[in-house]
Amino acid sequence: MLNYNHNQIEKKWQDYWDENKTFKTNDNLGQKKFYALDMFPYPSGAGLHVGHPEGYTATDIISRYKRMQGYNVLHPMGWDAFGLPAEQYALDTGNDPREFTKKNIQTFKRQIKELGFSYDWDREVNTTDPEYYKWTQWIFIQLYNKGLAYVDEVAVNWCPALGTVLSNEEVIDGVSERGGHPVYRKPMKQWVLKITEYADQLLADLDDLDWPESLKDMQRNWIGRSEGAKVSFDVDNTEAEGKVEVFTTRPDTIYGASFLVLSPEHALVNSITTDEYKEKVKAYQTEASKKSDLERTDLAKDKSGVFTGAYAINPLSGEKVQIWIADYVLSTYGTGAIMAVPAHDDRDYEFAKKFDLPIIEVIEGGNVEEAAYTGEGKHINSGELDGLENEAAITKAIQLLEQKGAGEKKVNYKLRDWLFSRQRYWGEPIPVIHWEDGTMTTVPEEELPLLLPETDEIKPSGTGESPLANIDSFVNVVDEKTGMKGRRETNTMPQWAGSCWYYLRYIDPKNENMLADPEKLKHWLPVDLYIGGVEHAVLHLLYARFWHKVLYDLGIVPTKEPFQKLFNQGMILGEGNEKMSKSKGNVINPDDIVQSHGADTLRLYEMFMGPLDAAIAWSEKGLDGSRRFLDRVWRLMVNEDGTLSSKIVTTNNKSLDKVYNQTVKKVTEDFETLGFNTAISQLMVFINECYKVDEVYKPYIEGFVKMLAPIAPHIGEELWSKLGHEESITYQPWPTYDEALLVDDEVEIVVQVNGKLRAKIKIAKDTSKEEMQEIALSNDNVKASIEGKDIMKVIAVPQKLVNIVAK
């Protein structure tokens, strides 16, 4: 039997789409719109893997489906091309990251085109293109002008051997991932973005989004809003004046606060530590600087800490309490100090037991000899709070603290401001100049883009600055008006910057005068469907929402949120249910599949594997099965000589009415909910029915091809042209169904004589009771059963049964 030649057909239609710009999006500002967005990829050296097309195929199906429904569809693709791997490659090989990136993009683009996605390539963006990052820099200037970008001393991961600062992800167990060199925490001047200013909005507006609840919860936990009180403890020390400020969600337990713990980096530590403890404290601070935040807060690890020799005064009980330092308290969270209530907190209890510190019970209900009690109960040993339950005690405690000027009600966030600068070459230059008189200004907007200088010397500066610090022609500037000397900022932006706003640039990618035309932004925003991996659930999506909200407040974008509906595709695993990885040698290259089975088969298979959000193992058998289905479709419609099968006719003998209308209904509903696997099952049901009948009604097979085309577009176009159509299937109207034909016209009724089954007869649905009786009585089997008997009565139940009582 003849199967279709995928290599030939797929190449033919890809060329056709390219030449005719079939998927070019026009800004028909009045037309109903649909914006389908993929998370644009980082173009790595490895090229596309089979995980990429899963999400891309889903958005492509929806884009093609919406075009057929008469929507103006925006479906673009671009490249998130700054970032560490390219720089790493440049460091290792001495090659320019630009060349490396360009080559990788060419590979990715070829692979993506070979999969038949309906992108409008005229809107392609690349974060490393100066015409693009001009606007990334412009947004930074707006953030700066709004007071949302500032310089701060921040503890960073400093690796002396590599001469550079590393991100948390690049540090493993206190050493650099690359080379295994020791890494220390060291304060350095960094650019920080004030995302905390938007914490409440970022939290509240999640409620209006059509996102998976699990993902919203991840963002809620990351923002981590908690209500409580700020409490001040005076340091009991004649030489060192000072207050230790703590944030607590349980100010009602303050009478049980038997010691304070400061982070080793806390500003007060050095001034309050007494002489006899100075050496121990210093040694502990050095040790702590070698650990990442993650290691320091690991619940499973043994608690460590040292006493500073200093005491503070509990503001309500008046008791003296010891001040300790311990690495499980982070300087970056809350105030960098905690009041420890060991009787009612597991971590504090463990610490108090280890260092033999007092444990004071202030809520009854547990046995603090054995463990901390974290439940509810009446307050005891708590002065004016005695006898009160939880909520009432919190309110009263805050009142008492306020009266003494020692505290107040406060909301705290786990969310920290966003550390924005990187000591790297391959990123957007930050458009700021530091002048010799100590002031700093942003680069004038008309001078943007501030270009990343080309250099063959990409190596760490050794000072903790980026490699840009080595390039004098870039760094040194003189103000033409005043003659004042200045130095450009040498840090660059993180990879997150370009991906924070790329979806806006697709809307107007060639605009030289503004980020995007306000009318176009009004037409296209928000993004209607955004599909990508769950690994970006928190950072990318939170940062993009933050920038969008700033742009909304500046009047640049018309919506409060960027992405209305978001969906995470699952992961495609290797055949043995393991994650695909180069080291395991189980990575599947889509190029091989396109060659052997065809792009349509790959697309169909990845959608048919299971629910779009599930993690599913790759299976060659499943892939072969998907190809067999497409071959079956081809053979049903096309003769060996390539002509249309005579089985396809223009008269309707009604045999496929029900299954066709059911198929249109099911596929339409499933596409709306991204249930592609069940939609494909229904398409298979339809084809099976077509094989059982002698004739297939042409409008039904045309409707079928329209439903198949978004999933398998090349074979869809080819079959559409075989059906005698000259234009592309892309903008053909989506099929509709007739409710009345979803059910059979005929029903099968049961005929009983004296309660025993005597016949099953097919009759028209609307047959009257009288007609049902006549039909039943004229049936041969029934006649034989009642021969020589008197009919006492006949009961007819429409569409169900006829019961004859005879004696």
From Swiss-Prot:
Q: Say which domain of life the source belongs to.
A: Bacteria
Signal peptide residues are none
Reactions it catalyzes: tRNA(Leu) + L-leucine + ATP = L-leucyl-tRNA(Leu) + AMP + diphosphate
Q: Please state the protein's primary subcellular location.
A: cytoplasm
Location of the motif 'HIGH' region: 41-52
- Annotated Gene Ontology cellular component terms: cytosol
Alphabetical keyword list: Aminoacyl-tRNA synthetase, ATP-binding, Cytoplasm, Ligase, Nucleotide-binding, Protein biosynthesis
Residues that bind ATP:
K582
Subcellular locations according to the entry: Cytoplasm
The record places the motif ('KMSKS' region) at 579-583
| Biological-process GO terms, alphabetical | leucyl-tRNA aminoacylation
Q: Give GO terms: molecular function aspect only.
A: aminoacyl-tRNA deacylase activity; ATP binding; leucine-tRNA ligase activity
EC numbers, comma separated: 6.1.1.4
Pfam families linked to this entry = Anticodon_1, tRNA-synt_1, tRNA-synt_1_2, tRNA-synt_1g
Q: Which family does it belong to?
A: Belongs to the class-I aminoacyl-tRNA synthetase family.
This chain's protein is named Leucine--tRNA ligase
Ranked from the top, the taxonomy reads: Bacteria, Bacillati, Bacillota, Bacilli, Bacillales
